[in-house]
Amino acid sequence: KGVDYHITIAGVDIFPQGYSAIASRVSEFSGMNMLADIGNGTMNIMNINNGNPDIQNCFTEKFGTHQCTLKIKENMMKKHHANIDENIITDFLCTGTADVLEDYLVTMRGTTKEYVSEIFRRLREHNYNPNLMKLHIVGGGGCLVKNFTDFDKNRVYINDDICATAKGYEYLADLILRSRGDNK
């Protein structure tokens, strides 16, 4: 308390959101690919052409999983006059089911399916075409796609490793240190 501290930042490396989760495998990405990092508050989108990230075509949509949670809460109140706990919704989004009345499940599923349809509509706005490219989904929103829509498993890849981003940053940091000759 009352002590001023001064720091010097020696260097900063910046990467597009979601990139670290696929960095160790990006060289395997042949042809056109799209990366969608669907987090709690945003969906970050990046095109990757033959393993090369297209930094000029990165987009952020304020359309994360929390918006789906809010829509479920709203529809549950409108249709059933029920104030549903967000923990129930979170478990439902992760597993595809919940221990609630069937009428409630129908509302929750319908709302989530509409949300997932909107994810794909927004991806198409950024030139996603499943016939021309593969889609790689990272982040918590991948479970929504996995649980609430049909998709071509040969063209859409969902990385549900919750540590993928941290592992990717470790991989990238190691690459950078090695390229600088610091092999510690």
Question: Residues of each region from the PLM?
Answer:
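Nucleotide/phosphate-binding catalytic cleft detector across ATP-hydrolyzing
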Residues: 1-33, 52-67, 87-184
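Long, charge-rich alpha-helical interaction segments
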Residues: 70, 74-78
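Short, basic interhelical loop/turn and adjoining N-cap
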Residues: 80-83
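Active-site-proximal alpha-helical scaffolds that flank and shape metal-associated catalytic sites
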Residues: 36-40
